[in-house]
């Protein structure tokens, strides 16, 4: 998408009851080489166009899915704009997500290669208790936080579309 189209996309929330979300490119796999606009830069840009842009209260954000997005709106708008700033606005401590890949692998984090092969467990006849233990172990493996800002080479053995990102 062209950078010049971002305001037009955000403006859809002005006249329509939509939540338009902007996700900061995660530096994983091919995403590490792609140019991007940071969440804070995009928010500043939108505030220049819409000076009344203000964050929604926490309860209103939770009603929109209790995910990592931080939502903003302008008085009189029918919708909201959401920002998921994975690099510049770490939300790891409040992340309530795990990812189940299309290959049956449960990951505790998009930035992690850790996890468990639920498909293999299911096919081997694992008991409900064994499955529950594997899922709990994976959840406890969720990292405290990522370190994308260090610009380390974070390998992604699969495309983001395959790991639920």
Show which residues each predicted segment covers.
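Structural preference for beta-strand elements that scaffold enzyme active sites
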Residues: 19-21
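Aromatic/hydrophobic pocket-lining residues that form the small-molecule binding cavity
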Residues: 6
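Short, small-residue-biased leader/transition segments that mark boundaries at the very start
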Residues: 2-3
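Auxiliary Fe-S-binding modules of radical SAM enzymes
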Residues: 14-15, 25-165
